[in-house]
């Protein structure tokens, strides 16, 4: 999941070093100095029913979220919350349909991938006025605030932060005499060596379905490392898209090889759940994923067989890393905005957010969580390592300003599957991707 990104690394503590320094530094308030509407008397004086929808749905996450809502309701007996939990692969479309029809909805989970589209369509409320006098906002990390903002306006408060690392079967690597890969070429070579279809063993948990764009985007960016525009990372410093270069073709050739020679054939349709299940069930040796997979790995695997490694590097010897997130926003047409923000304030407070992060495998948004022993776990070791080497693992904020960002995953999945199945060439696929992003920039600049 994607969720976009930037931060400075702290040193020493997990939250400072860990994970793209997601727990790094807290900034001052932004927005107006008005009293936060969430603390107004109206919400406390009348009976209110809030409708809330989540996007990154999973059974365990939904169960824990309901426990949080029950605690909120016990402290606020005048406010009742109805939680809508669509299946993960359908959730964003469900949210967009409800917003377009202005169906009853007060609180929604906004993603870094959807915020530009929602803002462009006027679906969500800026939160600057609401957070201005909320004391705990001061301890939310700068990177969390950045992920929840667009054009310097805050639109959602992240419920946790994401950054990918490599999970690998340490026992398989040891038996094969392999070291964990440090770059994408080594990753593909290791995947091929560890693949044995006769044993139903494959090197890599490929994801060709929903969310398929994450890996090819990352490889292409890293193969264009020295020329990427850090303020607009699907583009180069000369204004062309990153898909227009010879390096992009080299990267995509490697990606196709990874699928054809090191991954299960049916993984062309896999989404998040399938790729994680393949790893936990002993079908695949490597998985590139966010820390929210950690609880599942601990539950379903002998964790001593799992190793972690930093994200692979490109030919430059460096790697871009991304901090992303999703979180809670308020619909622009909600009649209950004060009560809605009161709920968000509760869910986003340091105590509740840190507990939620532990339950879901995310990184908390508050700097006060930085010394928590929970995050000293070995599963977070590589995240810590990447955060401690900011010149080697360079933080990059993906651009969320383009309305087409939310549609890119679907476009990349459909065209990418055609390429992997051989019905489209690598050159033709790159041309389509280049045209897509060039048009996005053209439309954006024409506004």
Where are these regions (language model features)?
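Short, solvent-exposed loop/beta-turn-alpha elements that line the ligand-binding surface or hinge
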Residues: 128-140, 208, 225-250, 298-301, ...
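Conserved N-terminal structural module of periplasmic/extracytoplasmic solute-binding proteins
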Residues: 2-4, 8-16, 20-123, 132-135, ...
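Hinge/lid segment of periplasmic solute-binding proteins
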Residues: 87, 112-165, 179, 188, ...
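Extracytoplasmic/periplasmic substrate-binding proteins
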Residues: 55, 115, 215, 253-339
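Glycine-centered hinge/linker elements that transmit conformational signals in sensory
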Residues: 191-193, 237-268
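Periplasmic-binding protein-like
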Residues: 64, 345-367
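Long, aromatic- and glycine/proline-rich binding clefts that accommodate carbohydrate-like moieties
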Residues: 77, 306-310, 358-410, 417-418, ...
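Hydrophobic residues within well-ordered alpha-helices
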Residues: 95, 187, 194, 217, ...
